[in-house]
């Protein structure tokens, strides 16, 4: 009986790790780490969150990309022009020390200000 339990447990762990690993490495064509690699860097990742360090130079427009729901923490004052799929562009002032909740989104972002945009994105995986 113990041997059967050990084999079942091992099989469950292997299958679970395979599924989890596959879900984290399956390429999303709109993943910002892939399409905007010059501005989006993974700072931390586990099964629950992915934290991105984002630095958008003044005048830079990022390609269209996707984020799941999560929290943005702003580390600089800058002007962001965001265009969400199906909606008109909107310019927002981002202030250092503030934060904002975002639902899942597909968008482009342009830094229309004169300073670098610095953001920590906390993307939730559930």
Mark where each language-model region is.
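N-terminal export leaders
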Residues: 3-7
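Bacterial N-terminal signal peptides
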Residues: 9-17
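Boundary at the C-terminal end of the N-terminal hydrophobic targeting segment
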Residues: 21-23
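A short glycine-rich, His/Asp/Glu-containing loop-to-beta-strand
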Residues: 36-61, 68-72, 122
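Short beta-strand segments in beta-sandwich/barrel cores
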Residues: 61-62, 78-83, 99
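Glycine- and acidic-residue-biased ligand/ion/polar-headgroup-sensing regions
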Residues: 67-87
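Ligand-binding loop in jelly-roll beta-barrel domains
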Residues: 77, 104-126
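Short acidic-glycine-tyrosine-enriched beta hairpin
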Residues: 87-104
């Amino acid at each position: 009986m113990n041997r059967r339990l050990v084999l079942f447990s091992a099989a469950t762990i292997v299958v679970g790790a395979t599924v989890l690993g596959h879900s984290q490495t399956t390429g999303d064509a709109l993943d910002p780490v892939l399409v905007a690699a010059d501005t989006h860097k993974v700072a931390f990742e586990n099964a629950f969150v992915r934290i991105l360090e984002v630095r958008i130079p003044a005048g830079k427009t990022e390609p269209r990309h996707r984020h799941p729901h999560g929290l943005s923490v702003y580390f600089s004052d800058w002007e962001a022009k965001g265009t969400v799929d199906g909606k008109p562009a909107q310019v927002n002032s981002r202030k250092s020390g503030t934060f904002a909740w975002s639902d899942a989104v597909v968008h482009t972002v342009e830094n229309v200000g004169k300073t670098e945009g610095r953001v920590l994105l906390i993307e939730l995986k559930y």
